[in-house]
């Protein structure tokens, strides 16, 4: 599969006085249709990298290519047409008086004909299960519902890539499950390229690939099973382990033999059930 994002020797600083770079010689490629999770502690460079990919920040050196376009000041608006971003606080993205008006806003800016806009608003509200709230004011929605509306607004302009920048961090557990499930569906069924920037290790474990950033550098890049099976790396940089791995560590401390390979929650439950039957 071809790479939809190519980043070479990317360097960025917020000021010349910084002792270290916010992004320091980052190199990576992301394939079309992948769900990639970017993880790292606060200040590791995750959100800065996302903003560079979208052209909200311009790197001081290196190059970014998105869907065959080299990102420059001349091409930035063409690049942004290929990318949708969903931020941590959806209130900062709302501009419409009601839900359907907010979803339509991005299309209005692109000059999409009214009949086509109405068609897309209906389609994307159905896709995120928010049709019943079309006439509601966004401020009166729950956190999870607000994020669904923000996602609908992104879907309406039909990008190829969706970046979720800490989009679940302010949600309750139910809202978080809903949005992560929607990410999965958009990736599996609609083939969107998903980039999820998150502190939630359990969310990251559901991605196709996990990239670990620390102090502006990529320090690991692999499938979730291999990243989380080597838990020492994560704990050294201040990250938690996914729940199944944390449970395995507790069982080890009690002298119980556990599998070496990474287990997701379903795999952990299966292993516990088999172990109980043997005993």
Regions found by a protein language model. Give the residues of each.
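The feature captures the beta-strand-to-loop junction immediately N-terminal to the Walker
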Residues: 39-41
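Helix-to-loop junction immediately C-terminal to a conserved catalytic motif
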Residues: 54
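Conserved ABC transporter NBD signature motif
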Residues: 62-70, 79
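Conserved ABC ATPase "signature" region
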Residues: 115-133
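Conserved ABC ATPase signature
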Residues: 137-141, 145
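Catalytic Walker B motif of ABC-type/P-loop ATPase nucleotide-binding domains
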Residues: 162-165
